[in-house]
């Protein structure tokens, strides 16, 4: 059976220098090893030597969307003023827990903002690349924008359930029924394409 995982906080005394040597996420003071991070305590030893004591952070749980970060999100609902989304990835890193975001009508396009209609840009279930423009507060969500050519819908499904193909910057087409639907289509950059 694996030993229980021990979590520690910054400044917590882990052991004395005779019991281990300091590794990453630690520092020494007065003959003791202390944690410099919040995370899991790890002890590794090779060939019966004094174990190296280190503290590893759970990176995926610590990752938060920050202003300017490109995020991948899924549209959950739309109305005439904004689209509600769940943020699933920050860059290419998946999040343990989804964050809520809002794309306002005026943040969808860089031009002709007064002519934008939400239902011609997004539909519930669409996967969207967006950029964080504001962190919001305790009551509100992250504010996101798609007002760049590289941002917008990257995956959408037609009413028949088939993944649609982009045919212009504002339309996608179902390959099965050839029905066209309006979307704010992203010009996907090569680094985001998975082959």
Curated annotation (Swiss-Prot):
Q: Which GO terms describe its molecular function?
A: RNA binding
Q: Which UniProt keywords apply?
A: Cytoplasm, Exosome, Nucleus, Phosphoprotein, RNA-binding, rRNA processing
Domain of life according to the entry? Eukaryota
InterPro entries per UniProt: Csl4 (IPR039771), EXOSC1_C (IPR019495), Exosome_cplx_N_dom (IPR025721), NA-bd_OB-fold (IPR012340), S1_domain (IPR003029)
Q: SMART domains given for it? A: S1
Keyword rRNA processing part of the UniProt annotation: yes
UniProt domain S1 motif: residue ranges:
66-147
Q: Which Gene3D superfamilies does the record match to this protein? A: 2.40.50.100, Nucleic acid-binding proteins
Q: Name one Pfam family in it.
A: EXOSC1
Q: Where in the cell is it found?
A: Nucleus, Nucleolus; Nucleus; Cytoplasm
The chain residues annotated with the modification Phosphoserine are 21
Q: Which SUPFAM superfamilies match?
A: Nucleic acid-binding proteins, Ribosomal L27 protein-like
- Subunit and partners: Component of the RNA exosome core complex (Exo-9), composed of EXOSC1, EXOSC2, EXOSC3, EXOSC4, EXOSC5, EXOSC6, EXOSC7, EXOSC8 and EXOSC9; within the complex interacts with EXOSC6. The catalytically inactive RNA exosome core complex (Exo-9) associates with the catalytic subunit EXOSC10/RRP6. Exo-9 may associate with DIS3 to form the nucleolar exosome complex, or DIS3L to form the cytoplasmic exosome complex. Exo-9 is formed by a hexameric base ring consisting of the heterodimers EXOSC4-EXOSC9, EXOSC5-EXOSC8 and EXOSC6-EXOSC7, and a cap ring consisting of EXOSC1, EXOSC2 and EXOSC3.
Family indicated by similarity: Belongs to the CSL4 family.
The function of this protein is: Non-catalytic component of the RNA exosome complex which has 3'->5' exoribonuclease activity and participates in a multitude of cellular RNA processing and degradation events. In the nucleus, the RNA exosome complex is involved in proper maturation of stable RNA species such as rRNA, snRNA and snoRNA, in the elimination of RNA processing by-products and non-coding 'pervasive' transcripts, such as antisense RNA species and promoter-upstream transcripts (PROMPTs), and of mRNAs with processing defects, thereby limiting or excluding their export to the cytoplasm.
Protein name (database record): Exosome complex component CSL4
């Amino acid at each position: 059976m694996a030993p229980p995982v021990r979590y520690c906080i910054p400044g917590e005394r882990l052991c004395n220098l005779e019991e281990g040597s300091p590794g990453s996420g630690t520092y020494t003071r007065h003959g003791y090893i202390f944690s410099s991070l919040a995370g899991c305590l790890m002890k590794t030893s090779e060939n019966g030597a004094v174990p190296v004591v280190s503290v590893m952070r759970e990176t995926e749980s610590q990752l938060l969307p920050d202003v300017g970060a490109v995020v991948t999100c899924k549209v959950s609902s739309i109305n005439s003023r904004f689209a509600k989304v769940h943020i699933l990835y920050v860059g290419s890193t998946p999040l343990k827990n989804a964050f809520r975001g809002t794309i306002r009508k005026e943040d969808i396009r860089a031009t002709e903002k007064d002519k934008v209609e939400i239902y011609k840009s997004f539909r519930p279930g669409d996967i969207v690349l967006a950029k964080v423009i504001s962190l919001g507060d305790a009551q509100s969500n992250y504010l996101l924008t798609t007002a760049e050519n590289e941002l917008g819908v990257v995956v959408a499904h037609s009413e028949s359930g088939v993944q649609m193909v982009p045919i212009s910057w504002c339309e996608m087409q179902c390959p099965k029924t050839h029905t066209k639907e309006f979307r704010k289509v992203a010009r996907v950059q090569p680094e985001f394409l998975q082959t």
